[in-house]
Amino acid sequence: MIKAITKNLYSDIPKETLYHYTTFTGLVGIVDSQVLWASDIRYMNDSAELKHTADLIRIEITQRITAGHSKPKLLNQFLEWVTHRITNGHMLFAASFRSNGNLLSQWRGYSKLGKGVSLGFNPSYILKCANEQSFQVGKCIYNSADQRRLIKQVVDLKWLLISTF
């Protein structure tokens, strides 16, 4: 079942140009090395997304405990474990792309005083490179209802696995 959830998350394969916003220094590094690096997400702009994920899990588990779940201690242990794994455990690496090459929000983040670039990449090439490195390409989920639904599915599945032991 976790494979089905994962497959669904990564099933929306990009077909249009993907854009990577960076600084001129980043551009020079990419051109000189002919390599696009994935960075540790804890040190990127996106690090808040990890904390947000942990917060959503905490809310879901707290709601279950408040509703009178039969094993609150076990749920709290799961919460501690998953929070640690998300914030301190696995090293997660990411390279960020957008489907729009001209977004004001991205220019503000990457072009201090107008000194940034938006590099367009063929999505087939990005997918090929990701597959060679055992990376997965997927869209960020920004819709809060979709985020909560996904968290609920994962907690349900993990609870099912834990409670069978």
Describe every region a protein language model picked out.
Residues M1-F165:
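Partner-binding and oligomerization surfaces adjacent to conserved cores of proteins
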